[in-house]
């Protein structure tokens, strides 16, 4: 099993003043959406540069549309590369979804779970990796309308990773949300993911629209069933860098640190000999 006991936090602009003064030791890395920072100048731009010079950063994109029907926006990918190079960021991930098709859709749409889609996405990933000169990492996404399917979501994710020879950002909350919304076994999905492909993890809170409908909002605390899945993930696949996502209803840093330290606790427990041999 791979051991990378690190915990990160999604960086928001409203956090810049505080973290430019001091970053808590429990935060090992930050994650940002490059689209929100690439053209940032002035005070925010200077503060962001100050942080990237001193701290580890990952990037998690929003608008690449890796599964989209239109030609890949190679100009945009080159802009991403320039941003990554400038800030010395090696990790770049995106959603296994699409957000364009005769215009921008302003949402992340699920890709049909078909062999044709697997090949289509893999070809586009090869283009991206060639331009970025970095490994490309894909995230399993939450979705609410079931796409056309020749295989399960689990089989589709695994097939894309294998065909494209790329790595996985495993979002534990998305597994839980989808398991409720689409009625499958979250633990079985988690255990079926290929350990050797995992690069890092996401964990977050969600919104309970109804008993059988969960919405991935990143706007609340992580709930117990998701914490349990995280523990199972570490026991099954090993400990990986894990990012706490909190995009809305953001509490004070000391409240975020409670969840960050909880992740550290799960990592420490999973690394104990009795758990590694389980």
From Swiss-Prot:
Belongs to the UPF0276 family. Pfam families: MbnB_TglH_ChrH. This is UPF0276 protein Shew_2240. It comes from Shewanella loihica (strain ATCC BAA-1088 / PV-4). It comes from the Bacteria. InterPro entries: MbnB/TglH/ChrH (IPR007801), Xyl_isomerase-like_sf (IPR036237).
């Amino acid at each position: 099993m791979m051991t990378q006991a690190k915990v990160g936090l999604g960086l928001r602009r409203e956090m810049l003043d505080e973290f430019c003064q001091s970053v808590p030791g429990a935060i090992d890395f930050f994650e940002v959406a490059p689209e929100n920072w690439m053209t940032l100048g002035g005070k925010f731009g200077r503060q962001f540069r100050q942080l990237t010079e001193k701290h580890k950063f990952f990037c998690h994109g929003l608008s690449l549309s890796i599964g989209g029907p239109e030609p890949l926006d190679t100009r945009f990918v080159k802009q991403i590369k320039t941003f990554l190079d400038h800030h010395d960021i090696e990790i770049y991930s995106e959603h296994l979804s699409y957000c364009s098709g005769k215009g921008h859709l302003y949402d992340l749409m699920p890709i049909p779970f078909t062999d044709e889609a697997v090949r289509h996405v893999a070809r586009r990933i090869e283009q991206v990796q060639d331009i970025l000169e970095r490994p490309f990492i894909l995230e399993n996404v939450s979705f609410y309308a079931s796409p056309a399917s020749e295989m399960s979501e689990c089989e589709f994710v695994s097939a894309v990773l294998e065909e494209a020879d790329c790595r996985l950002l495993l979002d534990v909350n998305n597994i839980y949300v989808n398991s409720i919304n689409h009625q499958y076994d979250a633990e079985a999905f988690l255990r079926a993911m290929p350990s050797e492909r995992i690069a890092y993890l996401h964990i977050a809170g969600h919104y309970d629209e109804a008993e059988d409908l969960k919405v991935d909002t990143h706007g609340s605390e992580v709930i117990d069933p998701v914490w349990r899945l995280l523990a199972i993930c570490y026991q099954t696949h090993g400990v990986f860098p894990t990012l706490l996502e909190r995009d809305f209803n953001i509490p004070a840093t000391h409240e975020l640190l409670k969840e960050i330290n909880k992740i550290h606790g799960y990592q420490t427990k999973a690394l104990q000999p009795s758990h590694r041999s389980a």
